[in-house]
């Protein structure tokens, strides 16, 4: 996506920090609670990365000194440089904000000694009224789930640039069941039904990265069929995960020791997905049985 700036402001307790986390998942470089005067400098630093940082998202709240004046000045600088930008103003019903503060036990930034949260909310609304009028988008989060907030923010971001997509990260891990299933796995595939190279004395010393073991495993029709079924399943599932708002998918492929069969199958799935997605590969247990094999 072309470089763009996303400014989050609004009422305390309305979801600014959560919105920033969502934008981080969308590939923005994110900074929380930054003074408006520093934003133009931060933009320069981002642009100097030659495209490595394609979007900047910042949270600016009322605690900044000379908030209104410096905020307006920041917006004018961004406009003068013809940088696409959005100002998202978040708000919520008074009772919802009070409930959120009671649940988190955090202190409202404008809460004065002896005052109440409601009084602080009303004071903040007064101070932010002019900023609200500058907003390109105003969102009331009173009845939003996190998923619904994600959907709204994605729509706002794509209105700036239609090519934006979440940074969807896929990690493929081969493992041995004898060492335990990866605790962060979303999908687990058991390949212990495949013939085991461990029982061939000539293949036993090699890992699934070797041509010898790869050739043995992939020569089996059931292995090739299994790989094709997994590819079709992932082609079906991954777009649904993306649509749902997920940004991480951990796929675990296991055999007995995690040295032979799982490594081969994990490699094949990685080779298939890597050209289309941000994909990482980890062979967790490939070296754990080496001392046994010698």
Swiss-Prot record:
It holds the Pfam family PapZ_C. It comes from the Bacteria. GO terms for molecular function: ATP binding; GTP binding; molecular adaptor activity. Keywords: ATP-binding, GTP-binding, Nucleotide-binding. The keyword GTP-binding applies. NCBIfam families: PRK05416.1 (NF003828). Displays ATPase and GTPase activities. PANTHER family: RNASE ADAPTER PROTEIN RAPZ. Belongs to the RapZ-like family. This is Nucleotide-binding protein Dtur_1129.
């Amino acid at each position: 996506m072309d470089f763009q700036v996303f400014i989050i402001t609004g009422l305390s307790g309305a979801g600014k920090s959560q919105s920033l986390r969502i934008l981080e998942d969308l590939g923005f470089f994110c900074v929380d609670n930054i003074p408006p005067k520093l934003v133009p400098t931060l933009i320069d630093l981002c642009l100097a990365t030659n495209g490595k940082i394609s979007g900047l998202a910042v949270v600016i709240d009322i605690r900044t000194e000379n908030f209104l004046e410096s905020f307006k000045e920041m917006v004018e600088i961004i406009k003068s440089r013809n940088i696409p930008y959005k100002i998202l103003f978040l708000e919520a019903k008074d009772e919802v904000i009070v409930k959120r503060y009671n649940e988190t036990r955090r202190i409202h930034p404008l809460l004065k000694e002896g005052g109440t949260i409601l009084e602080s909310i009303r004071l903040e609304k007064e101070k932010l009224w002019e900023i609200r009028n500058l907003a390109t988008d105003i969102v009331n989060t009173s009845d939003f789930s996190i998923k619904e907030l994600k959907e709204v923010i994605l729509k706002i971001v794509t209105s700036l640039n239609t090519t934006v997509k979440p940074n969807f990260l896929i990690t493929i891990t081969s493992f041995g069941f004898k060492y335990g299933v990866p605790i962060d796995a979303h999908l687990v595939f058991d390949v212990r039904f495949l013939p085991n190279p461990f029982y061939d004395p000539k293949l036993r010393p090699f890992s699934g990265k070797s041509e010898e073991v790869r050739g043995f495993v992939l020569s089996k029709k059931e292995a090739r069929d299994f790989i094709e079924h997994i590819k079709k399943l992932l082609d079906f599932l991954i777009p649904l995960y993306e649509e749902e708002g997920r940004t991480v998918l951990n796929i675990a492929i296991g055999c007995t020791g995690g040295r032979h069969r799982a490594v081969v199958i994990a490699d094949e799935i990685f080779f298939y997905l890597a050209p289309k997605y941000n994909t990482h590969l980890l062979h967790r247990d490939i070296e754990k049985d080496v001392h046994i094999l010698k």
